[in-house]
Amino acid sequence: MSLLPSSSTGILRIFGWFAGVVLPVVLLTALFALILGAGNAILGTWVNQFFSGFWKWLTSFDFSIGRVIFWTFVTLLSLALIRPAQTGRFWWEWMDRIGRFPAPTKPSHAYWRSVLILVALNAIFFAANSIDAFYLWAHQSIPQGVTYAQFVHQGTVQLIAATLLSAILLIVLFNQDESLSGRPVLRTAALVWIGQNLFLLTSIALRLKLYVDAYNLTSPRISLLIFLLIVGGGFIILSFKILREKSLLWVTGANLGLVFTVFYAVQFLDLGAMAAEYNVSRWERNPARNLDLNYLESLGSSGWHSLQRVAEKPEPGGDPFGVSAFLAGVRRDNEGGKFNVNWRSWQARRAWNLHQLLSSH
């Protein structure tokens, strides 16, 4: 380490610390383990097992291009988080520079252009929301000749795209000079448009509910609902920008914080199990409903508890659905060691679900 220049930083100093501190410890430990292992049969067995296992672990790595690139990226990101560089505001100044557009040469033209855009788009959204209010909210039905799949799948994508484009357009309009964005008429029209976008999001959620009522709930449909909540939260953040004249940097940071918080929280939820429990609960209340057992079985461990509830439901003729046989197969697979997977494939959720299944047997 003393041979390195005093000005050296980053990877050179990390390598020097490893060579001067870690490497001698590793080498001396291995040397004395081998010497003592040669004079002690039990210790020697342990040392041989350790080195054999270590060599097997070292040579079993998957050095494919994709994995090398991914873990290199993770390593570099981890180093940056452990010891961040002193960049100051260098990486964020560009956002401040584009936070506001320059003042227009003809303010009246820019003002009326913005007003007419908001008025026209409010009128279009009002028409779409009025149709939804009539068919969805008042009658809770779909037009004649339109299937639930068409009503949900073909309509939802376009409506979500419309709301996202609305958010982008509002950001552009209210990054104009404050002499324009601060006008009460523009603010009022923008807030009305945000309200219409939120109503449109609730209509999409109601479309999803009608589809689930007709068929079943699945984890992707729960994910769609979570996505709608994120978009709605983004519009609320946008409302604060408009009312408080927040910068583009603030809007970006607030939205990134919202997305990170939701994604971090959702990873702890078992969406498959939630969908399975919901479907089985509705089937228990109304056995005439169609219950997609193939979907429950495809969920793996997330569907075992719900399948156990189906198996415990008394049915004429024994087990007409074959659920008990399926769960018995899961138990046999466990006894046969099928679930004793590599430690890298171990999942706490599956282990807990397996414990629940076996304890209920």
Model-predicted segments: where are they?
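Juxtamembrane membrane-water interface segments of multi-pass membrane proteins
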Residues: 2-17, 46, 80-118, 131-151, ...
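Short aromatic-rich membrane-water interface segments that cap or initiate transmembrane helices
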Residues: 14-17, 52-69, 144-161, 217-229, ...
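Extended, domain-scale alpha-helical bundle/helix-rich regions
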Residues: 16-91
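Alpha-helical transmembrane segments and their membrane-interface junctions
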Residues: 26-42, 121-140, 203-210
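Alpha-helical membrane-embedded segments
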Residues: 26-31, 65-82, 228-239, 256-269
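Internal/C-terminal transmembrane anchor helices
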Residues: 118, 122, 248-271
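Hydrophobic alpha-helical transmembrane segments in integral membrane proteins
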Residues: 262-289
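Extracytosolic and intramembrane catalytic regions of membrane-associated proteins
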Residues: 294-361
